[in-house]
Amino acid sequence: MIAVDYKGDIYPCVRYMESSLGQDAPPLIIGNVYDGIVQNSLCEQCVKQLKAVNRLTQSSDECINCRIAEGCSWCQAYNYQDSGGDVNHRATYICVMHQARSLANSYYYNRYYLQTN
């Protein structure tokens, strides 16, 4: 979801704005309302980096081979902020909690399914 700030700068998402990132990482500007998107080399570089991001570029082998990873949600901007400005970083400190939640959901769904069918 594209976001625009009071100066007319365009961001790929509100989470990439300076107001969301604070001092943790530089804002990621992809253009402005006056000149458009990708009108200079810096914006073009940002867009190329974002287009290249996927689960494989942001994940370690541990994440890729995780049996829960298929349903694992992640926010590119949060990962960018957590790393201090690297779009190919993935925050993994919540993995244990996500795995526990996913396994609990499976357990209770299966239990419900067995009781109702």
Question: Which residue ranges define each predicted feature?
Answer:
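Active-site lining segments that contact anionic ligands and/or coordinate catalytic metals
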Residues: M1, D5-K7, A25, Q58-C63, ...
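Local cysteine-cluster metal-coordination motifs and their immediate loop/turn environment
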Residues: P12-R15, S59-N79, M97
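Short cysteine/histidine-rich zinc-coordinating motifs and their immediately flanking basic loops
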Residues: C75-N88, S106-N110
